[in-house]
């Protein structure tokens, strides 16, 4: 559906932009140094305004003094095929630094929460647990944190996925060709028409690949290296909060997966335990991106949960 959306397009670093959607109050991050920010990053194939619920968050967040900004990274649209979580992290840190200081704000006046959808959830977890760069996020929110590897198993079969992994390792990684783009004929059933490097293919489809954070067959030791490693907020003794919001009817999760049990495993792994938000949960009736095929209550539940979370962060 065609539509126009009022807002401000920020060039947060050379050739990369972020779109600040402006609500009814017309208050912006530039005009108010105390205004807090929900920085949103989508999943594979997403770009500006491609996740349907983002626009629905603008006015509810505006009413409690928050702005929502959707960030474009080098991995947006089809860029993910030759990208990595490390490159995404560098882009996201540049965006956080930009918005932390725009309009004369600083760390003491502006609070920032990073929210990721789908593979954007990997960006959130990487930022909070593995990044070597400073952490100025008071919280991370992962919506539809799903396993890309298990999604590949679901749609292409476990054996075919393993065959692809073995072939890529033998023909590319073992020969030092990890940055080379794979032949379309070999990967189109997995990645469509997106040019995909050997490294990114392995990141997404191999057991314990660099993107393999949310698979149900990972061990407690695996989760301890990610969920169990939340970093302190820079300049503080406090740690960032982590909120996990799974979709009840997520089409990219196998019907045989017990989402409630998996969510509990994630949460039980979070360290320090003070970072384990009680607001994590399963969005009732929600599809992967809480889109039109979701139940009517899904979007309302998501908005209410986010409002509750963001209000609680103001007092921290």
From Swiss-Prot:
Main location: cytoplasm
InterPro entries with a match to the protein in the record: AB_hydrolase_fold, SidJ
Keyword entries, A-Z: Cytoplasm, Nucleus
Molecular-function GO terms, alphabetical: hydrolase activity
Compartments, as annotated in UniProt: Cytoplasm; Nucleus
Keyword Nucleus: yes
Nucleus found in the keyword field: yes
GO cellular component, one term: cytosol
Gene3D superfamilies membership: alpha/beta hydrolase
Domain of life per record: Eukaryota
Protein family according to the UniProt entry: Belongs to the UPF0613 family.
Protein name: UPF0613 protein PB24D3.06c
Protein source organism: Schizosaccharomyces pombe (strain 972 / ATCC 24843)
């Amino acid at each position: 559906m065609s539509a126009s959306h009022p807002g401000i397009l920020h060039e947060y670093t050379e050739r990369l932009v972020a779109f600040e959607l402006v609500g009814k109050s017309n208050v912006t991050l530039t005009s108010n140094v105390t205004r807090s920010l929900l920085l949103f990053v989508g999943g594979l194939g997403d770009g500006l305004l491609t996740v349907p619920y983002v626009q629905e968050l603008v006015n509810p967040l505006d009413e409690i003094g928050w702005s929502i900004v959707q960030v474009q990274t080098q991995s947006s649209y089809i860029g993910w095929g030759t990208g990595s979580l490390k490159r995404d992290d560098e882009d996201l840190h540049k965006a956080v630094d930009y918005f932390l200081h725009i309009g004369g704000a600083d760390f003491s006046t502006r609070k920032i929460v990073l929210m990721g959808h789908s593979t954007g959830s990997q960006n959130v977890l990487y930022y909070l647990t593995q990044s070597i760069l400073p952490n100025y996020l008071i919280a991370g929110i992962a919506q539809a944190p799903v396993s890309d590897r298990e999604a590949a198993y679901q749609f292409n079969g476990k054996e075919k996925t393993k065959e692809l992994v073995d072939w890529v390792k033998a023909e590319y990684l073992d020969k030092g060709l990890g940055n080379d783009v794979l032949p379309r004929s070999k990967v189109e059933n997995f990645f469509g028409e997106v040019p995909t490097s050997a490294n990114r293919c392995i990141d997404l489809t191999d057991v314990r690949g660099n993107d393999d954070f949310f698979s149900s067959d990972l061990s407690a030791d695996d989760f301890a290296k990610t969920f169990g490693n939340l970093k302190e907020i820079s300049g503080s003794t406090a740690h960032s909060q982590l909120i996990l919001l799974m979709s009840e009817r997520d089409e990219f999760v196998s019907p045989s997966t017990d989402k409630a049990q998996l969510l509990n495993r994630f949460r039980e792994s979070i360290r320090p335990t003070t970072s384990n938000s009680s607001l994590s949960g399963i969005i009732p009736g929600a599809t992967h991106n809480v889109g039109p095929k979701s139940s009517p209550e899904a979007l309302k539940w998501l908005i209410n949960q986010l409002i509750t979370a963001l209000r609680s962060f103001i007092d921290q």
